[in-house]
């Protein structure tokens, strides 16, 4: 079982994550995690904070000489902007200053419902934790999960497939080629022509004091048949993936495979027909069963079927606008324009990295549940035995 917790506020001293369930013997490094953290901070349309924070992870426990040792792994990322917030975010009562309270809630954020739920008269106490800054730690945890999956030939990749209504075209490209193109893109997309139009759209909404949303896609290749289960609702892998992706700030919809389009088509155009070719095993495939289409997105009945897992998520435009929306002061009940916090114009490329990370965590967790052991070597023996079984099925 793989589980993790994150802690920390956006302008606090640091962000922290504790991961439990990573087996002994996995090679991980701060340098590798930092590459993924940099990917999260990049992208066209990001805000001024990215110029301040250059995230660098520190591994504080669970790793010795470059390998996990089986105990909980602790990761932290220091907030460089903390130096400017030491008194505003101090844990000490002597620094309390009611004059700096934030009382004007921003539409679209957790500000007002959070303040009402926790009985706060300062929405700073809500917005600091609800901020997408927290996703830095989920990317760090996801980097560890991706390293684990990579040791078994499983890759997890995130892309921007739509932004401001402009769609990227895949044009029959392989998953490897998609990753190559997206890695060169400022918008994490694989369609250079669409990228140019997406950038122009971001520029136009920025000039208007507005923000832009989009759609991200995560593709998992190499996952074996049999991850997840049909036997209980909370063990269905598609349900777990949907929850993980929906938990990302500003995500308002998730679909797997053909998703919502399945509701518009007859069943004959939706379900993936099953074929068998024994020669596939001789060519290195895990099983002779295969599909010619993948409308299911690699999951049927909550269980992986051996095809690529495909998840898409809709990200709303960031609700912090430089041309603020109307709101109401929490204390005086007077109408005001909402508070403007430093923010991005478009964070869809970052959402692709975060979605990739949370999907990797869920796939790694399901993998460990299926093939679990205390060390990487033990899990590999279990996995190899399962692959032998599949070939004979």
Swiss-Prot record:
One of the Pfam families matching this protein, by short name: Chorismate_synt
Stored CDD domains: Chorismate_synthase
Pathway(s) the chain acts in: Metabolic intermediate biosynthesis; chorismate biosynthesis; chorismate from D-erythrose 4-phosphate and phosphoenolpyruvate: step 7/7
Positions contributing to FMN binding: 129-131, 249-250, 301, 316-320, 342
EC category name: lyase
PANTHER family linked to this entry: CHORISMATE SYNTHASE
Protein name as it appears in the record: Chorismate synthase
């Amino acid at each position: 079982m793989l589980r993790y917790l994150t802690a920390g506020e956006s302008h606090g001293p640091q962000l922290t994550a504790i991961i439990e369930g990573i087996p002994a013997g996995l090679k991980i490094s701060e340098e590798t995690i930092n590459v993924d953290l940099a990917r999260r901070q990049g992208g066209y349309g990001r805000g001024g904070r990215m110029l301040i924070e250059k995230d660098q992870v520190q591994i504080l426990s669970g790793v010795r000489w470059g390998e996990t040792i089986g105990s909980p792994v602790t990761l932290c990322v220091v907030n460089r902007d903390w130096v400017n917030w030491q008194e505003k975010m101090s844990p000490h009562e002597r620094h309390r200053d009611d004059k700096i309270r934030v009382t004007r809630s921003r539409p679209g954020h957790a500000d007002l419902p959070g303040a009402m739920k926790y009985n706060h008269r300062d929405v700073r106490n809500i917005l600091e934790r609800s901020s997408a800054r927290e996703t830095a730690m989920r990317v760090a945890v996801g980097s560890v999960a991706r390293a684990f999956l990579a040791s078994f030939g499983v890759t997890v990749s995130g892309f921007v497939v739509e932004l401001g209504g402009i769609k990227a075209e895949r044009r029959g490209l392989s998953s490897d080629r998609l990753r190559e193109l997206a890695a060169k893109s400022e918008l994490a997309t694989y369609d250079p022509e669409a990228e140019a139009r997406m950038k122009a759209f971001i520029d136009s909404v920025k000039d208007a004091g507005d923000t832009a949303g989009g759609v991200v896609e995560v593709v998992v290749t190499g996952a074996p048949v049999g991850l997840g289960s049909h036997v209980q609702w909370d063990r269905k892998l598609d349900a777990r993936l949907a929850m993980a992706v929906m938990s990302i700030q500003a995500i308002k919809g998730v679909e797997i495979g053909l998703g919502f389009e399945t509701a518009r088509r007859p069943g004959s155009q939706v379900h993936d027909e099953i074929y068998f070719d024994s020669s596939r095993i001789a060519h290195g495939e895990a099983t002779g069963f295969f599909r010619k289409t993948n409308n299911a997105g690699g999951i049927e009945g909550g269980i992986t079927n051996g095809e690529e897992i495909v998840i898409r998520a809709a990200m709303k435009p960031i609700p912090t606008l430089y041309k603020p929306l109307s709101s109401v002061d929490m204390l005086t009940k007077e109408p005001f324009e909402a508070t403007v916090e430093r923010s991005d114009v478009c964070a869809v490329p970052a959402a692709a990295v975060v979605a990739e990370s949370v999907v990797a965590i869920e796939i790694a967790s399901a993998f460990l549940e299926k093939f679990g052991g205390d060390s990487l070597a033990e899990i590999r023996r279990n996995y190899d035995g399962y692959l032998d079984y599949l070939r004979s099925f």
